[in-house]
Design a protein with these regions (language model features):
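Small-residue-biased structural context
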Residues: 1-236
Length: 236
């Protein structure tokens, strides 16, 4: 029988909840559907019906939705199963593509609109800062692909010995700092010629990207990492 996952910080979702109600409660959850390649429309189906239709684990989807809606949510290890590992890797890979192909270019496009109103020096400084920021994030994604994802997918029996889970630690804090730095630069230092409306829109995109990357980091730390440990213990 379907039941709510019992955890202190669980967002108020249940498998019987209608997809429309889920999205209405937290519209940013739409990005999860994109990353999981879930088909629209949903009609009047529930979370459990949608997961059955799309071939996703209900429990895993509930964890992802709860972590996205409530950044303090931490999945209980008793609900984690080794067979979830492959699906969470695909979700994280899709998240990397979502950032690289959608969020980062979308933010860059708004930056270019701001730069049209700036002097040459401001254009050069801000463009270089954002390019470095983007490059750092993409390099981190590529490192995770080489040292974590490809090892798990390509040679699962070697996960315990080969997977470098230390990559989940410091780089995420650095990405967060860089997100705050570029927001501060836009907020404090751009000349008045850059319209306030454009600066506000740019800041909204930067903060949305930062917050989504924080959620992404939480998924890696509190879902992927313990799943790797659980999988490793079951294959020894």
């Amino acid at each position: 029988m379907n039941k709510k996952i019992s955890t202190a910080h669980l967002a108020s979702f249940s498998p019987e909840m209608k997809i429309f109600e889920l999205v209405e409660s937290s519209p940013s959850l739409l990005s999860i559907f994109s990353r999981l390649n879930i088909r629209l429309p949903f009609g009047d189906i529930s979370i459990s019906e949608m997961c059955e239709r799309e071939g996703h684990s209900v429990e895993l989807f509930m964890m992802l939705a709860s972590m996205h809606a409530d950044t303090s949510f931490r999945p209980s290890k008793e609900h984690l199963k080794p067979e979830m590992l492959g699906e969470i890797i695909e979700y994280l890979r899709a998240s990397h593509r979502y950032y690289a192909e959608h969020m980062l270019p979308h933010t860059a496009a708004h930056l270019e609109k701001i730069l049209q109103h700036c002097d040459t020096l401001s254009q050069s400084v801000l463009r270089r800062f954002y390019d470095d920021y983007t490059r750092y994030i993409i390099d981190h994604f590529n490192e995770e692909e080489r040292n974590i994802f490809s090892i798990i997918v390509g040679c699962a029996e070697e996960v315990a010995r080969e997977c470098n889970c230390n990559l989940f630690d410091m780089p995420h804090a650095d990405i967060d700092d860089r997100s705050n730095d570029i927001a501060s630069l836009i907020f404090k230092n751009l000349p008045e010629e850059a319209p306030t409306s454009l600066r506000c829109t740019m800041l909204e995109h930067i903060y949305a990207l930062r917050d989504d990357l924080r959620r992404h980091s939480n998924v890696e730390m509190y879902l992927l990492r313990p799943l790797i440990e659980i999988y490793s213990n079951t294959t020894r």
